[in-house]
Amino acid sequence: MIKTVLFDLDGTLLNTIDDLADAGNWVCAQHGWPTFTVEQFKHMVGNGIPKLVERFSPENPRTPEQLAATLAEFTARYDAHKEDKTAPYPGIPELLDELRAQGVQCAVFSNKADPLCGKIIAHYFGTGRFAAVRGSRPGVPTKPDPAGLYALMDEIGADRSATLFVGDSDVDILTGHNAGLPAMGALWGFRGRAELTAAGADALAAVPEDIFTYIQKG
């Protein structure tokens, strides 16, 4: 029986793509660089903000100094506008409350910067729904490396044999599997069925309630 569910953030709990794309395109426009569609941004996110910035920055020039400056621009812009269009996916708040009522603890593990994770989760979900919220931190490898996930499970006392990881991308499925956990794909997120299936998702959720059903069957 699953007793702990660890969630990815972007594309799983929250639909953040419009605010991420707007911030990225704002930076691009400031420099006269090409901009991108929201659909294109869906395939740029997932590996952390530094990698996102690298992906939307032109290859020439792409020096470490330029990338660092662009990262600072993006981070400031996104932090100021991260709640303009972002919203929880329909059914997510209800799922979290249902899991809590059944004694299933939940936590967040994201490649988004740790301070941003805490702020955005608190804004949309308040306190009490998550045992812990952890994003990328200096010295801790990002997903799909399982090191941060191990640390999170130890922090909240999660039994690895009774823990499920849920996310919307191949990175999330790999993260769960690298940590020895079953990994469930969220079909409402940024990537879709083909990528999640190819990554070896143990199950797929078409709607958030499917996560609860999966746990009940387990």
Feature-to-residue mapping (PLM):
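Active-site neighborhood of HAD-like aspartate-dependent phosphohydrolases
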Residues: 1-43
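Substrate-recognition "cap/lid" segment bordering the active-site pocket of phosphatases
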Residues: 84-87, 113-166, 170-179, 193-195
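Short acidic-hydrophobic, aromatic-tinged amphipathic segments that line or gate anion-handling sites
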Residues: 203-207
